[in-house]
Amino acid sequence: GLMSTLKGAATNVAVTLLNKLQCKLTGTC
């Protein structure tokens, strides 16, 4: 459903942002 799609998209965005943040903090990209 729509909520499932939105939840999946939000999760993808959150993971991407966390990866970028970790990349900047730890220098492991």
UniProtKB/Swiss-Prot annotation:
Keyword Disulfide bond attributed: yes
Paired cysteines (S-S): C23-C29
Cellular localization per UniProt: Secreted
Role summary: Antimicrobial peptide.
Pfam families cross-referenced by the UniProt entry: Antimicrobial_2
Protein name: Brevinin-2Rc
InterPro entries assigned to the protein according to its UniProt record, in alphabetical order: Antimicrobial_frog_2
Keywords: Amphibian defense peptide, Antibiotic, Antimicrobial, Disulfide bond, Secreted
